């Protein structure tokens, strides 16, 4: 199996807010899903009746966006007779690695970083997992978004910070790293975010590229 076509909508509507606004996200889902489906079918040169199954995220995630996606998928299923499968969005992130790495065998350890989640899982076999550790506060993505806002950068924060960090000196500033203790598999990003905030207030002349690095 393989991914034959993928289409992603941009998140520019959230940029001025510095993060995802749930109400706006759900409205954008409702508006863009029909167009994105048409684009996918057009690019693949197939019709909807040639689709064998519809998979849709049923959670976890923002309630409004989930409802928009599930409602759209159910409508397609009822109208076409194509069966529908509800997908756990975190499980999907785990299993997509098998598509990209054919040599990946069970068991394996997966670092799952998605939206509000930063977790470390032991994947024993299909459907069997053990949570080894997770963030105690902010997820990595949230920390990037908040960090970018502190630095006056755009949204989403991760790519914006990465872009300027490549131009900076990563050895110049030593920000603290939390929970760096042997045997501890959990994460914490709130302390790093706070350190960044105070550093920027006290060192306004420091090159922003070096701070990001």
Residue map of PLM features:
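Short, well-ordered alpha-helices that flank and scaffold nucleotide-derived cofactor binding pockets
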Residues: 74, 78, 96-100, 149, ...
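Short beta-strand segments
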Residues: 55-57, 88, 109-114, 121
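Conserved phosphate-binding catalytic cores of ATP/NTP-utilizing and phosphoryl-transfer enzymes
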Residues: 86-109
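N-terminal beta-alpha supersecondary unit
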Residues: 1-60, 89, 93, 212
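A short glycine/serine-rich beta->alpha loop
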Residues: 18-24, 56-63, 130-135, 181-185
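Short Gly/Thr/Asp-enriched flexible loops that form oxyanion-binding sites at enzyme active sites
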Residues: 56-81
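A short helix-loop
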Residues: 4-6, 105, 112-113, 120-209
């Amino acid at each position: 199996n393989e991914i034959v076509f993928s289409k992603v909508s941009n998140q520019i509507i959230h940029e001025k807010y510095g993060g995802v606004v749930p109400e706006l996200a759900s409205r954008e889902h409702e508006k863009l899903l029909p167009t994105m489906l048409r684009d996918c079918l057009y690019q693949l040169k197939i019709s909807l009746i040639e689709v064998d199954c519809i998979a849709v995220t049923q959670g976890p995630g923002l309630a409004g966006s989930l409802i928009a996606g599930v409602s759209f998928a159910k409508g397609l299923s009822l109208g076409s007779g194509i069966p529908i499968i509800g997908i756990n969005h975190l499980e999907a992130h785990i299993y997509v690695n098998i598509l990209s790495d054919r040599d990946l065998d069970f068991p394996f350890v997966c670092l799952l970083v998605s939206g509000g989640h930063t977790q470390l899982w032991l994947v024993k076999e299909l459907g069997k997992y053990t949570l080894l550790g997770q963030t105690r506060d902010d997820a990595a993505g949230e920390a990037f978004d908040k960090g970018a806002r502190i630095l006056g950068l755009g949204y989403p924060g991760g790519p914006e910070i990465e872009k300027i960090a490549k131009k900076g000196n990563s050895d110049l500033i030593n920000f603290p790293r939390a929970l760096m203790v042997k045997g501890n598999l959990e994460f914490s990003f709130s302390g790093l975010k706070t350190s960044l905030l105070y550093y920027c207030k006290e060192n306004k002349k420091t090159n922003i590229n070096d701070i990001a690095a």
